[in-house]
Amino acid sequence: MQNPHIPSFAQARVLVAGDVMLDRYWHGPTSRISPEAPVPVVRVTELEDRPGGAANVALNMAALGARAELVGVTGRDEAASILEERLAAAEVGCHFQKVDGLPTITKLRVISRQQQLLRLDFEEAFHSQDPAPFAEQVKQQLVHCGALVLSDYAKGALRDCPGLIALAREAGVPVLVDPKGTDFEPYRGATLLTPNLSEFEAVVGVVKDEQDLIAKGQQLIRDLDLQAMLVTRSEKGMTLLRDGLPELHLPARAREVFDVTGAGDTVISVLAVSLAAGAAMEDAVALANIAAGIVVAKLGTAVVSAPELRRAVHQEGGSGRGVMSEAQLLIAIEDARAQGERIVFTNGCFDIIHAGHVGYLDTARRQGDRLVLAVNGDESIRRLKGPGRPINPLERRMAVLAALEAVDWVVAFDTDTPEPLLESIKPDVLVKGGDYSVDQVVGHEFVKSYGGEVKVLDFIDDISTTKIVERIREKD
């Protein structure tokens, strides 16, 4: 499929309800084996606390720029206070039901040389708690939100999933569930379930092949009155299933996998935020797949930011060079500037590419680190040059220009001048070729206003597209 459309995540407000926990990390080097037992000795040099479980889902949403509200159950202890502090710093709204006498669920991981050596769980599940106060808190927050995520780790917070799903359906809010266990009946009526393959097989039995997965998944969708199911399949990617519609399979995108901790949280958070922001299901799934590829390349419970996701979507479209839309170009420029690179901008019709163009573009490229070449659209050229032009249509001109070594990015514009594009890009250097003075270059005042440079370069004498066209017509 084509690159997914990224909606405005800032417009999304999502409610997350489920099992919250604190992910604690002890980091340190290890260089010897304990004399007491055949285990490595880790000298702890760094302590780190991160929100986990449903709290990590909410944190992922906040990192994307969305507004997240979180309903969960905790103890009345230091771990709960740390969770509230970390989440408040990310502007996540916390609505915790605090229980006396029980600890906040905490998972301690010992990390050395970027490897997890040991995990210790500190928990007593909240299964004996009255679910009514939790449901009431969900009901209060639901009226302000565009999607509900149920993040189920089977720790007791989601004791009444049918009731919560009914509340959401009554409010017309889609419900996304990250399921747990061998029985998906409590999630009946949800909009979308996101089991991993192991969780899926625990319910439907061993999957023999692709067709078996599709058949069993669609049957489960009908049995549970779901709209869709997304089965995440580790290195095999993910598969979206809907009753009566063709399956959509997306291959895994991760180049390196360091840690799958929290990857499911990332998937469901991107799905929910995308749908709440108005994205189509196919786009939401594609974005979630790309985000999963980013997060598994990080160590520990991690989040994916909106700029990271935009850059990854941009990279999905190619090698980071060549013909781009304006939106793709702005992302590429943002990435280049983050590396300290200077952006050079030039523009023109480039109807018939000749030696003068090649020499000019090579010189222009040397004025900085990256060269943006803005090309007049066909209608723009007709207005400027007359009804007989262009000789070559836009797509062909851009393809040839993108193949030149000096050119990093090629983008089209349909206006008579490139000023709107200049205002979006804000290049470090504006370059124009020909017999101009700096004051005659379109956009010079704007570029100088923020400290940019404006330069005029020479074309090779006696070579121009107009002269070439005239010679061809004379011979005809």
From Swiss-Prot:
Keywords: ATP-binding, Carbohydrate metabolism, Kinase, Multifunctional enzyme, Nucleotide-binding, Nucleotidyltransferase, Transferase. Gene3D superfamilies: 3.40.1190.20, HUPs. The active site is at residue 265. The keyword Nucleotide-binding applies. It comes from the Bacteria. Its EC number is 2.7.1.167, 2.7.7.70. One of its GO terms (molecular function) is ATP binding. GO terms for biological process: ADP-L-glycero-beta-D-manno-heptose biosynthetic process. Signal peptide: none annotated. One of its GO terms (cellular component) is cytosol. Residues 345-476 are annotated as: Cytidylyltransferase. It holds the Pfam family CTP_transf_like. It is an enzyme of class 2 (transferase). PANTHER family: BIFUNCTIONAL PROTEIN HLDE (PTHR46969:SF1). In the N-terminal section; belongs to the carbohydrate kinase PfkB family. HAMAP family: HldE. Catalyzes the ADP transfer from ATP to D-glycero-beta-D-manno-heptose 1-phosphate, yielding ADP-D-glycero-beta-D-manno-heptose. This is Bifunctional protein HldE. It comes from Alcanivorax borkumensis (strain ATCC 700651 / DSM 11573 / NCIMB 13689 / SK2).
